[in-house]
Amino acid sequence: MDWFVEMLAKFLAVTLVLTLHEFAHAFVAYKCGDPTAKWAGRMTLNPAKHFDPLGLVCFVFAGFGWAKPVPINEANFKKYGSGCFWTSAAGVIVNYLSAFIFYPLMVLAVRFMGSAEQLTYGHEFLFLFTNYLFAFSLSFCVFNLLPFYPL
């Protein structure tokens, strides 16, 4: 049961973090003048629209994975340079901000847990979920700062 709780927490955390990351790219591209992601149905917080099933399974079980890239057309940006910059930076910024938000939630989860005798699967899930939210947000932020195409 412990394995299942950990895999569930990891799956839900990576789903939330990657969905926020991809949505940020789509939203900022739209605000900069490119409706391509909206037309493709990708400007949504629905995780099913952003995930490659194999990439998600690989992420949960192998520790690495991928989501479908958000389609953008740079020619539609009102200001080409700033549109490209902000659309690319949006995922990193959202991951950084979400790590900043998820860390206090993780600290609260640890304080909420109490003593070892009182722990339940719900406590374990809450701790693991908030821990993975923070860790994935921060690691995606750092990983996406690496200067490799198409990050």
What is each model feature region?
Residues 1-151:
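Hydrophobic transmembrane alpha-helices and their immediate loop junctions
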